[in-house]
C-alpha cells in the first residue's frame, strides 16, 4: 500500500455535511484495509481566487495509506459529489502523522486566546488597567 496526502474543498453551503462526508471516505479507505494517519478539518477558509463565483470553501486534509482500488474509488466519489469543488491527491514517500503548520498555528491561536481570556478574568478590580500599567512602570 502507498501513502497519499489528500486535500479536498467542500462548497461552503454544504459545510454541515463535512463530518458525514469524512466518515463515508473513512469507510472507503478502511474497508479496503487502509489506514488514516492524519485527518484535519481546517474549516472555512478564504479562497485565493473565486471558483464558480464562490469565495470561501471548507478544507479537509487527510494523510492515508491505501491501495490503488480504494484510491480510485475515493477519487471517483470526489468527482461525482457536487459539494466537493476541488480535490488534490499527492503520492507521499512516508506517512505524516504530525500536525500540519496550519493546524499548529490554529492551536497556538487557541491557546493564546484562552490565556488572554484567563488573564482578563483574573483582573477583577473593575478598572481599565491604567493603575496596573502605572504601577508596573514604576
From Swiss-Prot:
Skewed-composition ranges (Acidic residues): 121-131
CDD domains: bS6
GO MF assignments: small ribosomal subunit rRNA binding; structural constituent of ribosome
Originating organism: Thioalkalivibrio sulfidiphilus (strain HL-EbGR7)
Protein name as catalogued: Small ribosomal subunit protein bS6
GO biological process: translation
Gene3D superfamilies in UniProt: 3.30.70.60
Keyword terms: Ribonucleoprotein, Ribosomal protein, RNA-binding, rRNA-binding
GO annotation, cellular component aspect: cytosolic small ribosomal subunit
Pfam family, one: Ribosomal_S6
Keyword RNA-binding tagged: yes
Region (Disordered): 100-138
Family: Belongs to the bacterial ribosomal protein bS6 family.
Amino acid at each position: 500500500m502507498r501513502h497519499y496526502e489528500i486535500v479536498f474543498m467542500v462548497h461552503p453551503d454544504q459545510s454541515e455535511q463535512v463530518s458525514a462526508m469524512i466518515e463515508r471516505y473513512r469507510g472507503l479507505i478502511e474497508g479496503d484495509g487502509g489506514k488514516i494517519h492524519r485527518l484535519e478539518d481546517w474549516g472555512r477558509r478564504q479562497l485565493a481566487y473565486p471558483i464558480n463565483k464562490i469565495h470561501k470553501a471548507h478544507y479537509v486534509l487527510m494523510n492515508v495509506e491505501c491501495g490503488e482500488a480504494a484510491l480510485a474509488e475515493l477519487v471517483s466519489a470526489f468527482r461525482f459529489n457536487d459539494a466537493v469543488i476541488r480535490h488534490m491527491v499527492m503520492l507521499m514517500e512516508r506517512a505524516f502523522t504530525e500536525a500540519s503548520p496550519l493546524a499548529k498555528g490554529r492551536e497556538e491561536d487557541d491557546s493564546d486566546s484562552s490565556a488572554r481570556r484567563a488573564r482578563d478574568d483574573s483582573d477583577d478590580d473593575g478598572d481599565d488597567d491604567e493603575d496596573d500599567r502605572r504601577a508596573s512602570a514604576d
